[in-house]
Amino acid sequence: MEVRKALTCVFLTVFLCSGDAQDSVTDSVLNCCEGDVLFLLDSSGSVASYEFSRMVDFLSELLLPFSLGPDHVRVGLLQVGTEPHLEFGFDAYSSQQGLQAALERTKQLKGDTNTVEALLMARAQVLRVGVPGGARPDLPRVLVWLTDGVDPGNVQEPMARLRDEGVAVLVVSTGHGNYQVLREVVSPPTEEHLFFVDIDDISIIGEDLRNSIIEIIRAERLQVKSVSSTSAQLEWRPVLSGSGSGYYDIKFGPMRTGQIPGVPGGASTDPGSFQRITRPADSSSAQLTGLRPDTTYTVTLTPKNNQQVLNTLQTSFTTQTVNPPEPQIQLLSSLSVSESSSNSVRVSWAPLLPRLIQEYQLEYSALPSGPLRVLRVSNTHNSTVITDLQPDTQYLLTVSAKQTSGKERAMTVKVCTQEVLPALSDLQLSSVGDETVQLRWKGSFDGLRGYWVTWERGHSQRSTLYLPPNRLSTTLNHVPSRARVCVSPVYRTARGEGLCCTA
């Protein structure tokens, strides 16, 4: 039987607003970004038609707020099947109308889940800089992989090559996929780039996923980094480097009393507080020195060029104190779930602080309205096994670290138990002609979604066929003698244990 590990779904509180999504986002979001985003969509036979339709609808909603085009965001869609299929590349659509129509026309490929071949195509033809139809130079590149988690293959190596080449990798899994594998392939931080969600609830991660993409491709023109008590590093995207002339005029000073950060108003004009520096056209950074500790500064950067008028950019930052306060101890900083079965899960948390914590309290209930259960754990333990759970059920779990003073720190997750997967009980194979066999089996289990048939067609070749749950027989052609033929039941989250015969 294929063993599937349980997935931990981060509990999200989402506020949904009615109305036109395009009208509900501000201009700062619409024009926030520049970058190339490729979506790798699992379109194989392991994905039910309903699930595929939900994934495409999710992409439509996810991408609707973005401005598209050569000066904004470009989007590509690569489908995973027996052979990868580039539905459309980065140059295909520069308007939401065209993109949305293309998504509506997208059809499922079915066939095998050949994710590795699709990744090789993505790296060689789509995400590579400088090739026709490829990514743009000097801009962020993002790969978002949407998968049901069934048989992804050995994706770690091709994903690692993409990350080494500067591609940010994000993953959305709608099934009980291998958490360890998916955690390895995403770009850090994992908590912002790896999403587990049931297909019926996929819309709840839309805002978080969009924000994660925006964080990577945001066209931040003016950024302040490496801030100390007396200095800061100013960085910007060079807009004069191609002109060969001009310079950057930089002004900075303490913010005026009553001035709101981020609102134009210029630096303070108090005597001795105003500073000005310039940098040549090919510059993209400047060091700001002579700053006062624990002070909020406003800085403006104006590109000067006789050939064109360019916008003045402004930002603000606060220098560090001379003796910054010691960071507070996190009583509870991480929470994870592992070793899931159909009726139990292991819950682990960190850090373990027996000198500060009196006890840990676990509260959990089945969603949406199951009875609340409470489990208390000693302050010397950082994990426990919760038993007597219902199979294929989502639970809302809260772990609280309680101090003797009465203060506490709590974290909440969604826990998903495994589905019970009955095995196939009978399989009969009979020959009905030259290289033609007929299969019959017994099925009709609760929760059955269909049957997965595989057979050998020659040396190192294998064919697959997905059948609906009401089919209990099929005829296969081109099955050589002594070929191995297998049938497995398919459930919502995984395949059950199948049976095999030899032709």
From Swiss-Prot:
<protein>
    <recommendedName>
        <fullName>von Willebrand factor A domain-containing protein 1</fullName>
    </recommendedName>
</protein>
<dbReference type="InterPro" id="IPR002035">
    <property type="entry name" value="VWF_A"/>
</dbReference>
<dbReference type="Pfam" id="PF00092">
    <property type="entry name" value="VWA"/>
</dbReference>
<comment type="subunit">
    <text>Homodimer or homomultimer; disulfide-linked.</text>
</comment>
<keyword id="KW-0677">Repeat</keyword>
<keyword id="KW-0272">Extracellular matrix</keyword>
<keyword id="KW-1015">Disulfide bond</keyword>
<dbReference type="Pfam" id="PF00041">
    <property type="entry name" value="fn3"/>
</dbReference>
<keyword id="KW-0084">Basement membrane</keyword>
<dbReference type="InterPro" id="IPR036116">
    <property type="entry name" value="FN3_sf"/>
</dbReference>
<feature type="signal peptide">
    <location>
        <begin position="1"/>
        <end position="21"/>
    </location>
</feature>
<dbReference type="InterPro" id="IPR036465">
    <property type="entry name" value="vWFA_dom_sf"/>
</dbReference>
<dbReference type="GO" id="GO:0051124">
    <property type="term" value="P:synaptic assembly at neuromuscular junction"/>
</dbReference>
<dbReference type="InterPro" id="IPR003961">
    <property type="entry name" value="FN3_dom"/>
</dbReference>
<keyword id="KW-0964">Secreted</keyword>
<dbReference type="GO" id="GO:0062023">
    <property type="term" value="C:collagen-containing extracellular matrix"/>
</dbReference>
<dbReference type="InterPro" id="IPR013783">
    <property type="entry name" value="Ig-like_fold"/>
</dbReference>
<keyword id="KW-0597">Phosphoprotein</keyword>
<dbReference type="GO" id="GO:0005576">
    <property type="term" value="C:extracellular region"/>
</dbReference>
<dbReference type="InterPro" id="IPR050525">
    <property type="entry name" value="ECM_Assembly_Org"/>
</dbReference>
<dbReference type="GO" id="GO:0007409">
    <property type="term" value="P:axonogenesis"/>
</dbReference>
<comment type="function">
    <text>Promotes matrix assembly. Involved in the organization of skeletal muscles and in the formation of neuromuscular junctions.</text>
</comment>
<feature type="domain" description="VWFA">
    <location>
        <begin position="36"/>
        <end position="213"/>
    </location>
</feature>
<feature type="domain" description="Fibronectin type-III 1">
    <location>
        <begin position="218"/>
        <end position="324"/>
    </location>
</feature>
<dbReference type="GO" id="GO:0014032">
    <property type="term" value="P:neural crest cell development"/>
</dbReference>
<dbReference type="GO" id="GO:0061035">
    <property type="term" value="P:regulation of cartilage development"/>
</dbReference>
<dbReference type="GO" id="GO:0005604">
    <property type="term" value="C:basement membrane"/>
</dbReference>
<keyword id="KW-0732">Signal</keyword>
<feature type="domain" description="Fibronectin type-III 2">
    <location>
        <begin position="331"/>
        <end position="423"/>
    </location>
</feature>
<dbReference type="GO" id="GO:1902026">
    <property type="term" value="P:regulation of cartilage condensation"/>
</dbReference>
